[in-house]
């Protein structure tokens, strides 16, 4: 099995004016596709080629390959972006169990957003910031490069099932926001797909 670029459920301009059309098109068709091509090239003659990307992440710590770090960056890039695209949509509302858990565990939605923004802004260099479910505990964590919490703590420095994540690589925002990373981070709240986030919480 080889991985393929997932279709988006929306047009490239659907997240305007918060995420611009040109960035979305390049991000999806160029950057994500490149991660997939590299992952397929590494896995094509291995015993791991039949695994789904989620299965691959779950056993990543056990994989022994000469180019494991290259696979880590590229397979991580594939799953990170796959989660990212599905987690974006304008017009959804934070409600239900997810809203209750955020209020319960962070004190308020406003404090949760402020903490998420602060951790994202202070993440040095490229990476991702995540809201994850760690056995019923919601945590805000960051990972470097294309690491994913599903890789486990020994690989990514953290763990948990992602509820949603924000791409902090410059290619995700620089065409529109240049060096205004905080503006990009704050704009994210306008495009979070809370319906998908709630579904992931209930898994």
UniProtKB/Swiss-Prot annotation:
Species assigned in the record: Buchnera aphidicola subsp. Schizaphis graminum (strain Sg)
Catalytic activity: 2 superoxide + 2 H(+) = H2O2 + O2
Family: Belongs to the iron/manganese superoxide dismutase family.
Record protein name field: Superoxide dismutase [Mn]
Entry-linked SUPFAM superfamilies: Fe,Mn superoxide dismutase (SOD), C-terminal domain, Fe,Mn superoxide dismutase (SOD), N-terminal domain
Cellular component, GO annotation: cytoplasm
Entry EC number(s): 1.15.1.1
Cofactors: Mn(2+)
Lineage: Bacteria, Pseudomonadati, Pseudomonadota, Gammaproteobacteria, Enterobacterales
């Amino acid at each position: 099995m080889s991985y393929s670029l997932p279709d988006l459920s929306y047009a490239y301009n659907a997240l305007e004016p918060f995420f611009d059309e040109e960035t979305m098109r390049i991000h999806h068709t160029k950057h994500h596709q490149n991660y997939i091509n590299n992952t397929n090239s590494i896995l094509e003659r291995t015993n791991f080629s039949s695994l789904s990307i989620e299965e691959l992440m779950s056993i990543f710590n056990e994989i022994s390959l000469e180019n494991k770090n290259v696979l880590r960056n590229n397979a991580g890039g594939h799953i990170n972006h796959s989660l990212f695209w599905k987690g974006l949509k304008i017009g959804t509302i934070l409600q239900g169990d997810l809203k209750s858990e955020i209020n319960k565990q962070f004190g308020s939605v406003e404090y949760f957003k402020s903490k998420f923004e602060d951790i994202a802004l202070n993440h040095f260099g490229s990476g991702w910031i995540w809201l994850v479910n760690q056995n019923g505990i919601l945590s805000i964590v960051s990972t470097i490069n294309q690491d994913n919490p599903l890789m486990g703590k020994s690989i990514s420095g953290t763990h948990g099932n992602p509820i949603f994540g924000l791409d902090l690589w410059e290619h995700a925002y620089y065409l529109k926001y240049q060096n205004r990373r905080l503006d990009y981070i704050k704009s994210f709240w306008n495009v979070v797909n809370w319906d998908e986030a709630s579904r992931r919480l209930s898994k």
